[in-house]
Structures are given as C-alpha cells and as structure tokens.
Design a protein with these regions (language model features):
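Conserved SGNH/GDSL esterase-like catalytic core that processes O-acyl groups on lipids
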Residues: 1-34
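Loop/turn elements at helix/coil->beta-strand transitions in domains of secreted/extracellular proteins
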Residues: 7-10, 133-138, 165
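Active-site-proximal beta-strand/loop segments in catalytic clefts of secreted hydrolases
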Residues: 14-16, 141-144, 170-173, 190
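Secreted/periplasmic serine-hydrolase-like ester/acetyl group-modifying domain
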Residues: 15, 28-135
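Extracytoplasmic/secreted cell-surface and envelope-processing proteins
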Residues: 19-28, 148-150, 177-180
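Extracytoplasmic/secreted proteins, especially bacterial periplasmic and envelope-associated proteins
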Residues: 34, 43, 59, 124-127, ...
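Acidic-and-aromatic substrate-binding clefts and catalytic sites of carbohydrate-active enzymes
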Residues: 115-119, 145-152
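C-terminal regions of proteins
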Residues: 153-212
C-alpha cells in the first residue's frame, strides 16, 4: 500500500521502540481500532487476519466493524463535519510540561536477557524496510525529555548498518534532555520544541545530503 498511489523521494520514519519492535503484554488488537473503518481497502483485511484469524469472520458484521466509531462516523460521513478540521498531520501542543505529573512507562526489559523483542512487530518492520529502502529511507529518533537507554536502539542500529540506511538519533541530545521548555510531557514536544527540532532535523538532513 505504501507505494501504490505515490512514490515519495524521501521517507522519514519515526522510530518508537515500544511501538516498532519491543514486546508488549497487551493485545495487538489495540492497533486495529483506527483501521476498522478502512477494512475494505486493499491490503487492510490481511493485517486483521494476521493479528487474529477470527477477525475474518467478525468483520463480516457491519455492527462489529463500526461499533467503536459510530459517533465519529455519523459526524464525518452523514453530517459532513470533520473532527480534525484544520489538522494536516500535525497538532501543536502548547504549554510546558509539569514534572510532577511524569509517569514513565516500563519497557519490556529482562535483567538477565536484556530487552525483549517482538517477532511479530519485527516482521512488519522488515516488510516496511524492504519496500521503503529504495525510496531514500531515513530513520529518525525524536528528542525525549527522559534520557533513553542506548541499548534499546540496538536493533535499529543493526538494521541501519546492514542495509546502509541513515539513522538520525536525537533521543539523548543534551539540548533537549530534561529541558522543560521544549516538552508537553515526557515523550511529546510542545509547539516550541517541535519548531526547534524541525530546524535541527533539517540541518542534519542537509549534512547528510538527504534531499539530493
């Protein structure tokens, strides 16, 4: 689906370890939520079947397909209104983070074996890689308020090394780490931080001649 209708000259892929390749105790079903209403589009149905074979039969029911998004669909499709008016992929967050409200999630780490990787997620990551690497693929790790354990990025570093893919890592950049003015919470930049990071990222991309 990635290259079916449009072939980008460059693909910047935001690496999020917990989403892209770390093991989770929670079900994969949570990732299917926003795809339900697009189920009939080419290639979407096979993702559902891959997560859970019974989805093939559950999705035969229109009630099941839309039971969690009925109100949104009513607003968008029948009333002609959009719940995302004016948003084109970027929603600015205003205000600085409150360090008193920080709750850091636990990553899938085993003290004897290290981080636990998810073979299911890794398969999808490699599938994406094979399709996208010919389109000037660049992996990017955005700044975080927390200091990130560098070991958690080892799989991506290995993938980039083996496939000759650039990796731009801002996760532990001292300009951003623990700098409250750039963050809305521990993992999301606020509007000021997003503007600053955009500038810094463009500088790095130009250094690597990413757009030539």
């Amino acid at each position: 689906m990635l290259l079916d209708r449009y072939t980008p000259k460059t693909i910047l892929y935001e690496v999020t370890p917990s989403f892209d390749y770390l093991h989770e105790e929670k079900s994969y079903h949570k990732y299917l939520y926003k795809l339900k209403r697009h189920y009939d589009r080419n290639g979407i149905d096979s993702i559902f079947w891959d997560v859970d074979r019974t989805e093939r039969y559950k999705m035969l029911s229109g009630t099941y397909q839309h039971n969690s998004s009925f109100l949104q669909n009513l607003i968008v499709y029948f009333l002609g209104l959009s719940t995302d008016t004016g948003i084109k992929g970027y929603r600015p967050l205003y205000g600085e983070m409150d360090t008193m409200k920080i709750k850091r999630g636990k990553l899938a780490y085993d003290s004897s074996k290290g981080y636990r990787y998810d073979s299911f997620k890794m398969r999808y990551l490699f599938n994406f890689l094979q399709k996208a690497k010919k389109q000037n693929l660049i992996f990017v790790v955005s700044p975080m308020w927390y200091e990130m354990d560098t070991l958690v990025l080892e799989p991506i570093r290995e993938i980039c090394k083996e496939n000759d893919i650039p990796l731009i890592d801002f996760s532990n950049n001292p300009k951003y780490v623990h700098n409250n003015k750039f963050f809305k919470d521990g993992t999301h930049l606020n509007a000021i931080g997003a503007d600053e990071f955009t500038h810094d990222l463009i500088v790095e991309l130009r250094k690597q001649r990413a757009f030539q």
